Design a protein with these regions (language model features):
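Hydrophobic alpha-helical membrane-insertion segments
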Residues: 83-122
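Short, highly charged, low-complexity non-transmembrane loops/tails of multi-pass membrane proteins
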Residues: 172-188
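Membrane-helix interface/capping segments
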Residues: 56-87, 100
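Transmembrane alpha-helical insertion/packing segments
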Residues: 1-66
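Loop-to-transmembrane boundary segments
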Residues: 5-20, 77-94, 144-149
Length: 188
């Protein structure tokens, strides 16, 4: 069985676009709500946990969807146990490249400890926006990233897509299991 199969390019793009969509939707949430709680560390951490879970389940859903699609007889891709981890590569590479640009900006585009060029400011905003859902749980500011922030930034996409993909392989959906408890039954 080949790790990289024909047709996976579209799946990689789909996963990457799901990551970008999740970041943008959570950013809209952040700018309307999080700004009010940033000075309250406990509330800010709780909001970060909530946003991290929303991000996790967004990627989980994508992994689940791709596994269910791979099981169809007419697709060019096949299922295998850790394909979800392989499908997380675009997100991992994107996060790593943004981290390198962030480090570059803070090491080479600063003047007296402040970013002074449009490029440096752009790299900073891009990285902080891409990782903000974890910002209440760790320190990501001023060119400094806590070591455990990388655990969140890299492990969450791998775990979400892998767990979602494995669940999709076995036709398990956490949303279907929780639906009876979430929706009210109509009375006849």
């Amino acid at each position: 069985m080949k790790i990289f199969q024909e047709g996976m390019a579209k799946q990689f793009l789909s996963v990457f676009l799901s990551h970008i969509t999740a970041v943008l939707l959570l950013a809209a949430f952040m700018f309307t709500f999080v700004a009010a709680v940033m000075n309250k560390p406990t509330v800010y951490a709780a909001v970060s946990v909530l946003m991290s879970l929303m991000y996790f389940f967004g990627l989980y859903s994508k992994g689940n969807e791709l596994a269910r699609r791979d099981k169809l007889s007419y697709t060019t891709t096949s299922v295998y146990l850790f394909k979800g981890a392989v499908l997380s590569l675009p997100v991992i590479v994107w996060n790593f490249v943004l981290w390198l640009l962030y480090i570059f900006a803070w090491n080479f585009l600063t003047l007296d400890g402040q970013l002074f060029s449009f490029t440096g400011i752009f790299y900073n905003i891009l990285y902080v926006l891409n990782t903000f859902m974890f910002s209440g749980l760790t320190t990501i500011e001023g060119g400094y990233v806590e070591w455990y922030a990388h655990l969140f930034i890299y492990i969450v996409p791998i775990a979400a897509l892998t767990i979602g993909y494995i669940a999709g392989m076995y036709d398990f959906s956490i949303f279907e299991k929780l639906a009876p408890y979430i929706y009210e039954k109509k009375k006849k």
